[in-house]
Amino acid sequence: MIAEISNSQRTGYTASKIFHMQRNEIELFNNTYQFMLVHNYVNYFLTGGVFAMEEGDASGTGLWDPVKKKWSESLTSIISKDLLSKLPPVSSSIESIGNISKELVKEYGFNSACRIDAGSGDNMYGAIGTGNIDPGILTISLGTSGTAYTIVETPFVDPTGEIACFCDSTGRYLPLLCVSNMAGGYNSFLEKNGLSHSEFEALMTYTHPGNDGNVIVPWYEGERTPDLPNASPIYFGFSYDDLTKEKVARGLIEGHVLNLYEGFSKMPIEPKEIYLTGGLSQSKVWCQMIADIFNCKATPVLGEGAALGAALHAGWIWNNENGSNETLSKIVKPFITFNEQLRCTPKDENIKVYDNLKSLYSSITMRIRGLGGKDPFELKQGLKG
């Protein structure tokens, strides 16, 4: 699969949905003229009939190779010999796809010179909207799921398939990690214990980094990365006396960040700075935890990164197509606002502790997956307070 499309196949990709339709709703499949993502259809409507998908979103269909930049005839033919003819052309992400339709100009008064941007995915635009437009920056989105992505000049193909090889929306590439467990376990803990975010943060003051080697592997609803759909959470090292609200709280947040870090460790980057977005990014505890575990300065970005990125991308494309040589960086920089009060740098006293905890976490997950690894019980001894 990786040799064919430079990615593994995921159930959330478009390929699996079309495959399901072809097997279970054959009449609907046969009557489909063109498959599009939602924003491709919006563009189709705005332009009055342009069928187009751009490279960023095509990367996530599970049918298009972002390295060869073409639809996979082998994969499409496995689903149906007719599928390739039902897929739209893939346009460049740095060009518009056409003008707004005459009908919409007449009905709503749009400027007839209005061009329609090709559009892209939320993570591609999230990179722009958080100021992540040059190599060396890592954006982490802390929502129901967690994502981490960066910009690189050449494609990165992960032989394990855990890091997605995507095109970005600037003509470059966006290696992307997605874990399915992030805010879900945290929010459930708050709800079960009747805690506010500030009360949760207060609990953290009663414990110390490393949690004496008591680790929670937060696979609450299976896990996407690593690909373990039937997984459940693991509470490692907790004695009966350790099962306090305070220690479980620390184990939970450390586990979520460690789960993200373990996937990130396969990415082709040593970040010089991390930009944070998503609901949990405005928490001092989460920011500091990420700074310490990733051993890198971490700063939350204010606003809706993906929405801002879409607007800035459209402005950049408009400028380019109207003779301006203004760089994307120059356009983006004035609009990015950081929450300086929550800017966190790694604490020297925590870095060594978390280096040991990262090794312990990795040994636990490797043993569970049958991949060998070091003895987690032995590693835990070095983390006892």
Cite the ranges covered by each PLM segment.
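Active-site core segments that coordinate phosphate-bearing ligands/cofactors
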Residues: 1-5, 12-52, 62-81, 96-98, ...
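A conserved helix-loop-beta module that forms one wall/lid of the active-site cleft
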Residues: 80-92
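Conserved redox-cofactor binding core of oxidoreductases
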Residues: 55-57
